Amino acid sequence: MIVVTGSVTARADSFDEVRKLSLEHVRRSRTEPGCVSHAVHVDCENSLRLVFFEQWADRAALLAHFAVPASRDFVRSLQALAESATTIELYDATRVEKL
């Protein structure tokens, strides 16, 4: 399984638009083949920062997600509305145990 974490810190004047675009992106992404989960959360320590957590069945599914034009458009839109650079980190994960 591939785990993706990401974040964006919106400008104060663009937070509502960043939140709207992020929710649309998450909902669309959940319908893609290989998407196990996809969520966005508001950071409790910085209310302008959104944090993304995604799980993908495998790297091929994630690469297909990155190739979707709407995904590329989403990233470009966020970058234009962000206070600082967006972050994306990928992890290759194996579930050890569900507690």
Name the predicted role of every residue range.
Residues 2-9, 39-66:
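Short, well-ordered beta-strand segments in beta-rich or mixed alpha/beta enzyme
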Residues 20, 24, 28-36, 55-89:
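An amphipathic, aromatic/His-enriched active-site/gating alpha helix that lines ligand/cofactor pockets
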Residues 2-36, 40:
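N-terminal first-folded block
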